[in-house]
Amino acid sequence: MALVSADSRIAELLTELHQLIKQTQEERSRSEHNLVNIQKTHERMQTENKISPYYRTKLRGLYTTAKADAEAECNILRKALDKIAEIKSLLEERRIAAKIAGLYNDSEPPRKTMRRGVLMTLLQQSAMTLPLWIGKPGDKPPPLCGAIPASGDYVARPGDKVAARVKAVDGDEQWILAEVVSYSHATNKYEVDDIDEEGKERHTLSRRRVIPLPQWKANPETDPEALFQKEQLVLALYPQTTCFYRALIHAPPQRPQDDYSVLFEDTSYADGYSPPLNVAQRYVVACKEPKKK
């Protein structure tokens, strides 16, 4: 029943999102005339080679209108982003509910494990669709934006992806990509599923063994302080795997769509580090251990 309710709400939100997109285009078309007037006024001023009181007053009015138009369009876009975030949240809730209930399509019976190629594609899609933090002027990026860690009392929710420190079969410890199943306030411990085993491998871990992954990408152009910087030690997901390893930041992203360039610790190389490899913001978290000398 809850799944049906979620489906109907998602349909409503998609309709509302479509209307907001139409409003955005209408707002942009409406403001176009004013922008053309600004350009033409500047061209006349250049032709006459002077700034008369008339042009000064006219431009002040045109720019005031342009600013108001831009703010109106911005408000519509923010509403659209809120709708998208709500849709994604409902889809995630629906996925978790189906997983708990053990629901599967008749045409697709349960599989013990997901094909590795499919899993890698899903991880790439998750990184690409991670929302970009877009704050208002003066806003600071929140916790879990880029390199900014979660607050001390933060508890990851069921379905959230985390880096989890677990014991491997050989007894060694490693950081894996995992999904939160539950959290017990009585024991202060998480239950997490290894993402690579489709729930087959479940671990019970203390809070210090779980690092929540970023929930927003940081924009290098507006919030560079929310990114890890060159030579900073991190844990990064090694490409085409589901394990995190220690690495140094070689270069932070330069544009919102860019990845980090990182150097993984690797004793097979003379300097102890691999050549630069790209890792998405989604899969780079702080490493609290000291650098190797």
Swiss-Prot record:
N6-acetyllysine modifications at: K288
Coiled-coil segments on the chain, per record: 3-88
Keyword Nucleus applies: yes
Listed InterPro entries: SGF29, SGF29_tudor-like_dom, Tudor_SGF29_rpt1, Tudor_SGF29_rpt2
Biological process (GO), any one: regulation of transcription by RNA polymerase II
A GO term from the CC aspect: SAGA complex
Residues carrying the site annotation Histone H3K4me3 binding: Y238, Y245
Subunit annotation: Interacts with dimethylated and trimethylated 'Lys-4' of histone H3 (H3K4me2 and H3K4me3), with a preference for the trimethylated form (H3K4me3). Component of some SAGA-type complexes. Component of the ADA2A-containing complex (ATAC), composed of KAT14, KAT2A, TADA2L, TADA3L, ZZ3, MBIP, WDR5, YEATS2, CCDC101 and DR1. Interacts with (methylated) CGAS. Interacts with TADA3L, GCN5L2, SUPT3H and MYC.
Domain comment, as recorded: The SGF29 C-terminal (also named tudor-like) domain mediates binding to methylated 'Lys-4' of histone H3 (H3K4me), with a preference for trimethylated form (H3K4me3).
Name assigned to this protein: SAGA-associated factor 29
Species of origin: Homo sapiens
Record gene name: SGF29
